[in-house]
Amino acid sequence: MKPFRFKKFTVQQHKEVFRVGTDGVLLGALADVSDAKNILEVGTGTGLVALMTAQRNPTSNITAIDVNPVAAELAAKNFLESHFGHRMRAMHCDYKTFGTQKKFDLIISNPPYFETNPSEKDATARQQRELSFKTLISKTAEILATEGRFCVIIPFPAGPTFEKTCEENKLFLLRRITVYGNANVEPKRLILEFSSNKNISVSEEIFVTEKAPRVYSEQYLKATADFHEFE
């Protein structure tokens, strides 16, 4: 597969690993990565989100894990070929059995999920997922630092259940970004950010990716300006 080139790094791709997509770019661009020294990405795939995070937070140390050995190897290669490789590492690891004494300031994930009408290839890959939302949340609650944050991008319909499960695990909603493909359609994704501290108010944001078919919105162009090579 062709590599995907960004301004400051290149992402090599592989047929057995989820390719670079809008979800990952949005998560990498919009997640609050400030003041996070130790960062964990769960389900790194190509390593895209971890690389974007490393670029945005130059003092962070990033661990990226994936249950797919091909993905972990590919991410490791992409890290080494970047300017950020000295503070990044990729591991072939199942999050359910991930052993660590470290507490993370930020745990970030673009978890696998079922689409309503996915392509056959993606449907097969997603149906082989080992990590359920419930497992993702409970494990995160164990290893998140006291003042840490947990940030994910998920399908819009999954939001209420995901938020409820987080609250049951003492992870409280801090920020909700509702993502629309364009202004005339139903919401497509949610970017959710949680902390272990119960918040008095939740930050609510709206994000629209396109102003017309295949024409990015000004909001998207601004959010990704440090990454994409737009003409």
UniProtKB/Swiss-Prot annotation:
Its main location: cytoplasm. It catalyses: adenosine(37) in tRNA1(Val) + S-adenosyl-L-methionine = N(6)-methyladenosine(37) in tRNA1(Val) + S-adenosyl-L-homocysteine + H(+). It comes from Flavobacteriaceae bacterium (strain 3519-10). PANTHER family: TRNA1(VAL) (ADENINE(37)-N6)-METHYLTRANSFERASE (PTHR47739:SF1). Pfam families: MTS. Belongs to the methyltransferase superfamily. tRNA (adenine-N(6)-)-methyltransferase family. GO terms for biological process: methylation; tRNA processing. GO terms for molecular function: nucleic acid binding; tRNA (adenine-N6)-methyltransferase activity. This is tRNA1(Val) (adenine(37)-N6)-methyltransferase. InterPro entries: DNA_methylase_N6_adenine_CS (IPR002052), SAM-dependent_MTases_sf (IPR029063), Small_mtfrase_dom (IPR007848), tRNA_Adenine-N(6)_MTase (IPR050210), tRNA_adenine-N6_MeTrfase (IPR022882). It is found in: Cytoplasm. Specifically methylates the adenine in position 37 of tRNA(1)(Val) (anticodon cmo5UAC). GO terms for cellular component: cytoplasm. Its EC number is 2.1.1.223. Keywords: Cytoplasm, Methyltransferase, S-adenosyl-L-methionine, Transferase, tRNA processing. It comes from the Bacteria.
